[in-house]
Amino acid sequence: MQVKDQLSSLQPYKPGKSPEQMKEVYGDHAFVKLASNENPFGCSPRVLDELQKSWLDHALYPDGGATTLRQTIANKLQVQMEQVLCGSGLDEVIQIISRAALKAGDNIVTAGATFPQYRHHAIIEGCEVKEVPLNNGVYDLDEISSAVNNNTKIVWICNPNNPTGTYVNDRKLTQFIEGISENTLIVIDEAYYEYVTAKDFPETLPLLEKHKNILVLRTFSKAYGLASFRVGYAIGQEELIEKLNVVRLPFNVSSLAQKAATIAFGDDEFIEEIVRVNTEGLQQYESFCKENDIPFYPSQTNFIFLPVENAGEIYEACAHAGFIIRPFPNGVRITVGTREQNEGVISVLQQHFENKKRKSRDEANA
C-alpha cells in the first residue's frame, strides 16, 4: 500500500510507559506515574456520583454536536455556543485545525521545544515546519514573528508551554498578535490554563471579539482530571468554528465523555482546591532546586522541568524507586503529585545530585 511520502519521516506518538510496562523492566514496584501531567487527585467527586446514578443508552450515538457541553462551556466563558468546537481531546482538535487550514507549500511556525503534535500534523499535510528556539525556556515571540511569511498559515503558541511550564505574558502576546496578518491563524494552546497563578498571564478570550484569526484551545484532561474521557475544545469566531466543523468527525465525543465534562465544568471548588495543592507542590520542587543549586524553569502548570544533563540517569534512578517521570534530551519533566509523592521524587533527586557531586570531588582529587 502506498501512503504519503512524508509519513516516512514520522513515528507514531509514543506515550510514557504505563506502570504495568515499568514492572516488566524494574520489578514489582507500586509505580507512581508522574510522566504525563495527569491530575493525581482524579476528577471532581460530582462526576463519579452523577455517572453512577445516570443511565445512558449505549446503543445510541452520542449528541453529534455536544450541545449541552458546548452550551455549558459557552455560558461559563461568556461566549456563544456556536463559537465552541469539542473534540476527542486536544489531539483531535489540533488534527482538525491542521487538516482544515494546511496544504502543501504552506508552513507553520512554532517553538522548537513544545508540544510535538503541531509539527506532526503539519508534516502529514505536506507543510514546512519552522521551529524557533526557546529563549530561556520561553517562547521567543520576536523571533517567531520574524519567521512568519506569506506562506505561514498557522502560528502555534503553547501557553503555558509544554514541556517547560513557562509562559508568555499579556503584553508580549498582545503585541505579537497585533503584528501578525489576519491571513495567518494564531492558535493559543492553553491546556494548562486552570493551573496558572501569574497575574500577567494573558486573558485571551476577549481578543476573539477583535481578531478573527485567533483560536484558543483548552482541555478537560489536566486540571479537571478527565484524561481517559478525551475531551478538548476550541473557541474562536463563529465563522471559523463553522469551517472547522466541516472537518470534525461525526459523533467524535462519546456520551459518557460529554456528561462527565459537563458535570466537571461546574465544580469550581474542586478546581480551586486542585490549584492550591498544585501550587504547594510546585513550591516543594522549587525550594529544593534553589537550596541545592539545581536549574529549573518557573512553572505555571502542573509539572516542573529541570534543564539538566544526564536526564537518562535521573529517569533510571526515579524508575528504580517506583516513580515514572519524562526524560528529554536536555532535561526531565516531572508531574506534580501529592505531597508524599513529591517528597519521594525529591528524595531520589537529592541522592542523585549528592552522588554526582561526590563523584566530581573524587575525580578532582584523583
Swiss-Prot record:
It catalyses: L-histidinol phosphate + 2-oxoglutarate = 3-(imidazol-4-yl)-2-oxopropyl phosphate + L-glutamate. CDD domains: AAT_like. HAMAP family: HisC_aminotrans_2 (MF_01023). Belongs to the class-II pyridoxal-phosphate-dependent aminotransferase family. Histidinol-phosphate aminotransferase subfamily. Residues 1-11 have a biased composition (Polar residues). The lineage of its organism: Bacteria, Bacillati, Bacillota, Bacilli, Bacillales. Keywords: Amino-acid biosynthesis, Aminotransferase, Histidine biosynthesis, Pyridoxal phosphate, Transferase. The keyword Ribosomal protein does not apply. Pathway: Amino-acid biosynthesis; L-histidine biosynthesis; L-histidine from 5-phospho-alpha-D-ribose 1-diphosphate: step 7/9. Disulfide bonds: none annotated. This is Histidinol-phosphate aminotransferase 2. Residues 1-21 are annotated as: Disordered. One of its GO terms (molecular function) is histidinol-phosphate transaminase activity. It comes from Bacillus cereus (strain ATCC 10987 / NRS 248). Its cofactor is pyridoxal 5'-phosphate. The modification N6-(pyridoxal phosphate)lysine is found at K222.
